[in-house]
């Protein structure tokens, strides 16, 4: 292995037996017909399970709703993108010319997908207990900081409560674009809010994720503006 990849494996805290799994996890679909989306699918499920299991044992008296909200906070795209930046993943991603030109190595969705793909790759290279230890090590500070309660509500819920508390109409979400094939789509959603000059746009791999992204941006604009 060359030294840049060795640096990445040190950051990840895991030495791969099969280097090709790591290479595949870092390969975006824009770069090659063999890419990281199957690994991402696997890693997404493993991450959700590992975090759910940890929350269940860490918070024995917390109800299902709060645990679901805490898990959503920990596994959402921007949290994964933060992890990706901490690892310096953008320097190692294999992207096609178009994505490189448009700064894909900085994009939250691409970084988040790569983190999930790496989780899938670690699992295939080892086993569930090893990948559990790796993931929990990555999440140490976030697991220590997270608490049950209102702050874990998803963005759509928080936006709705924000508007209701000010006696304003509820937001209207409209899908304005869907691109890609059925198994690999990107949804674009506009969130219209009374009193805002223009709709807020969110994107995601499902309608729900796009709506949540739009709601998060709308909340930022409303609270910071």
UniProtKB/Swiss-Prot annotation:
Mg(2+) binds at residues 40, 113, 116. It is found in: Cytoplasm. Residues 154-224 form the DRBM domain. Keywords: Cytoplasm, Endonuclease, Hydrolase, Magnesium, Metal-binding, mRNA processing, Nuclease, RNA-binding, rRNA processing, rRNA-binding, tRNA processing. The active site is at 44, 116. Its EC number is 3.1.26.3. Pfam families: dsrm, Ribonucleas_3_3. Its cofactor is Mg(2+). The keyword Membrane does not apply. One of its GO terms (cellular component) is cytoplasm. GO terms for biological process: mRNA processing; regulation of gene expression; rRNA processing; tRNA processing. Its main location: cytoplasm. One of its GO terms (molecular function) is metal ion binding. It comes from the Bacteria. SUPFAM superfamilies: dsRNA-binding domain-like, RNase III domain-like. Homodimer. Belongs to the ribonuclease III family. Digests double-stranded RNA. Involved in the processing of primary rRNA transcript to yield the immediate precursors to the large and small rRNAs (23S and 16S). Processes some mRNAs, and tRNAs when they are encoded in the rRNA operon. Processes pre-crRNA and tracrRNA of type II CRISPR loci if present in the organism. This is Ribonuclease 3. It comes from Vibrio vulnificus (strain CMCP6).
